[in-house]
Amino acid sequence: MADVDELEDPMEEMTSYTFARFLRSPETEAFVRNLDRPPQMPAMRFVYLYCLCKQIQEFSGETGFCDFVSSLVQENDSKDGPSLKSIYWGLQEATDEQRTVLCSYVESMTRGQSENLMWDILRNGIISSSKLLSTIKNGPTKVFEPAPISTNHYFGGPVAFGLRCEDTVKDIVCKLICGDASANRQFGFMISPTDGIFGVSLDLCVNVESQGDFILFTDRSCIYEIKCRFKYLFSKSEFDPIYPSYTALYKRPCKRSFIRFINSIARPTVEYVPDGRLPSEGDYLLTQDEAWNLKDVRKRKLGPGHDLVADSLAANRGVESMLYVMTDPSENAGRIGIKDRVPVNIFINPRHNYFYQVLLQYKIVGDYVRHSGGGKPGRDCSPRVNIVTAFFRKRSPLDPATCTLGSDLLLDASVEIPVAVLVTPVVLPDSVIRKTLSTAAGSWKAYADNTFDTAPWVPSGLFADDESTP
């Protein structure tokens, strides 16, 4: 079996043991040359994970993944453990249910996301949700060479703002919107069990269950992808141009006051797109409601080459988002709750990166539901998906020192004050999912073929019109 060379610092060595390095290792290349056909995904992904976990367990004590793989291997042909060949064929013959168990082990081992070393390593050779659109457009040029994850963000910048406010939005969704529904707020890296080339990490999912260290998704599970809008962060001051429009929204929550609030900045987050026209790629929320048509902007017609956009627009145009306007803690003894609810015709932009993020989350969570017993017979195994847009203001001297969400959930003193949350359901047509994944998988395959002498083949099920792969 492929071993990682021993160095003084095993953690440092582990961080360099990527999927690309595994494919280029002499032992892997020798094993592949002795096969009667090219190795296949996702089996090769799981062989790599076995080799990686074998090294990790020496100092982590986590043996679950390797033990489960060993139970799938028919023969132990070496006193030092099973060979790559035995491991590969055991995993090649594994069922989707067994592969989902392996993926659940990986998810449980990688919680903590950017703070987890293994989470960073596993991105190598994976088309993640944030890379799906760029892979379709430009090819997976960075998939096998992902940029290192940075955790050193300027406190006053948009990335740090989003990170520190995300937990507050999770609290609002779980406690105030969903009414304490069973939820999981901490996810590791979720690799697709059916292909081994796609992977996601979720922000929040409600209606999930726990089975030991594993998360069990069900046909009632609902994904929430959270976006905290830094460009709408404002001060409670008459000199802030956003504040007057927020005041109008707070005093009279309605569609008209919300339109004014959204359009209080130069590049608003909601774009008006009439039927039959092509949206821009500028931001991720659209509307066809004429009340939002405040500027005469010419837009191209939908035409040849826009079939997927047209199908996605048709599926989402009737979506109704729900705006939750929050109470002001300075008027409620520090308590933040839901002041009012306003339904609005706002839906996701299928040309924006966030659409592709939730598409891949929907696909992979659906895989887990189907292959882990989380779906009931006769029911659709697909999860529901929402994108959450959260708006905040800076703290004011008038705000109490202690603020709570609801009556008892403390709001961290370092976090800004939430003023509104917009929940937008997302509809993902099957035809769009199939074509998107087929294009991305074909791009991954072509890049791997040109990069590695031992490139594994991608499952043919990912190719809608191509049976050239086994």
Curated annotation (Swiss-Prot):
InterPro entries: Herpes_alk_exo, Restrct_endonuc-II-like, Viral_alk_exo. GO terms for biological process: symbiont-mediated degradation of host mRNA; symbiont-mediated suppression of host antigen processing and presentation; symbiont-mediated suppression of host gene expression. It holds the Pfam family Viral_alk_exo. GO terms for molecular function: DNA binding; endonuclease activity; exonuclease activity; RNA binding. It is found in: Host nucleus; Host cytoplasm. It comes from the Viruses. Its main location: host cell. Plays a role in processing non linear or branched viral DNA intermediates in order to promote the production of mature packaged unit-length linear progeny viral DNA molecules. Exhibits endonuclease and exonuclease activities and accepts both double-stranded and single-stranded DNA as substrate. Exonuclease digestion of DNA is in the 5'-> 3' direction and the products are 5'-monophosphate nucleosides. Additionally, forms a recombinase with the major DNA-binding protein, which displays strand exchange activity. Forms a complex with the DNA polymerase BALF5, the DNA polymerase processivity factor BMRF1, and the major DNA binding protein BALF2. Belongs to the herpesviridae alkaline nuclease family. This is Shutoff alkaline exonuclease. It comes from Epstein-Barr virus (strain B95-8).
